[in-house]
Design a protein with these regions (language model features):
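PLP-dependent amino-acid enzyme catalytic core
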Residues: 1-313
Length: 313
């Protein structure tokens, strides 16, 4: 059973909420007089790394406050979110259920193997049903099967996730012009925008193809959390490389070069696409000379294990 009287932040001793900012020393940027800093959120926890901890922490606290002992959430077979929720369940003694898009494939990939090893119950939902996963019909079926649970949306994105991600801004102690992050559901970007409170500029890089919906998602999250709208942000849709989890030799070569130069490991699904976009926009002169840019490393390095178990397209 879940411990009822618990403060998430006090209990978890191994979270580093003061992750470093590391400057990128790269002639491709310096010759354009652009300064790039990486906010190393990948270093905040071994298994709930990057934006996942920020999205989870207030949702975990609410789960406890409501007296729930089961977390149910959704994700793909290689989901960083599924991985992080399973880890959280193990750490905080929650029962966790992962509703996975698609059919079962054995043996389990590294992401799902980790989830199961950490106590998560895996349940597969065919793709047609998955598209309406948060409908009252599907939720009722899941409640009948698994009993009472705290529902955490796919990707962990809701108003509490926005609250957690907004706190990233308060940990930045240098002046800057832009802050960037990769975008899957828009929760991290909404959090950054909220934390900026109308100052500076936040730029998200969509990792999905056809992600024009992200702007509406972000606006909705902002209105629900801050009751305000902001103009100091945008979502770039040009660097998805064909869609979620898609990549090619150009992106992989860039990621390998970046990691070699900086000694900062990144994956090509989220952070790698954002960084490619930043470099390309810098080359095209889209950032003013002298600009200081912060790129949020959203973790997800567990996904690198999965890349060796599937074909890169």
């Amino acid at each position: 059973m879940v411990k009822k009287e618990i403060n998430i932040l006090e209990e978890l001793q191994y979270i580093n909420e003061n992750t470093p900012l590391e400057k990128v020393n790269d002639p491709l940027l310096s010759e354009r007089k652009i300064s790039l800093f990486i906010k190393r959120e990948d270093l905040n926890h071994p298994h709930m790394s990057g934006n996942k901890w920020h999205k989870l922490k207030y949702n975990l606290q609410k789960t406890i406050n409501k007296g729930k002992n089961t977390l149910l959430t959704f994700g793909g077979a290689y989901s960083n979110h599924i991985y992080a929720v399973a880890a959280a369940g193990k750490i905080f003694n929650f029962r966790t259920i992962g509703i996975i898009r698609g059919e079962e494939h054995l043996p389990l990939n590294p992401t799902l193997s980790f989830a199961v090893e950490n106590g998560m119950k895996i349940y597969y939902l065919d793709r047609k049903s998955y598209r309406k996963k948060e409908s009252s019909e599907i939720i009722k079926q899941l409640q009948e099967k698994f009993g009472d649970f705290y529902l955490l949306p796919e990707g962990g994105t809701n108003e509490l996730a926005v609250k957690g991600c907004s706190e990233i801004i308060s940990k930045i102690d240098i002046d800057f012009d832009y802050i960037c992050c990769p975008c899957g559901t828009g929760g991290t970007l909404a959090g950054l925008i909220s934390g900026l409170n109308g100052n500076k500029f936040a730029l998200g890089f969509a990792v999905l193809k056809g992600a024009s919906f992200l702007k509406d998602n972000v606006n909705s999250l902002l209105k629900n959390f801050t009751y305000s709208s902001f103009l100091n942000w945008d979502v770039n849709l040009d660097y998805h490389f064909g869609g979620y989890s898609r990549t090619n030799s150009i992106l992989l070569d860039f990621v390998n070069r970046f990691s070699s130069i900086t000694k900062i490991l990144v994956e090509p699904i989220y952070t790698g696409k954002m960084l490619f976009g930043i470099y390309d926009l810098a080359e095209k002169g889209c950032f003013e000379e002298g600009s200081q840019i912060i790129a949020v490393h959203t973790g997800g390095l567990q996904g690198l294990k999965g890349l060796t178990s599937r074909t890169i397209r």
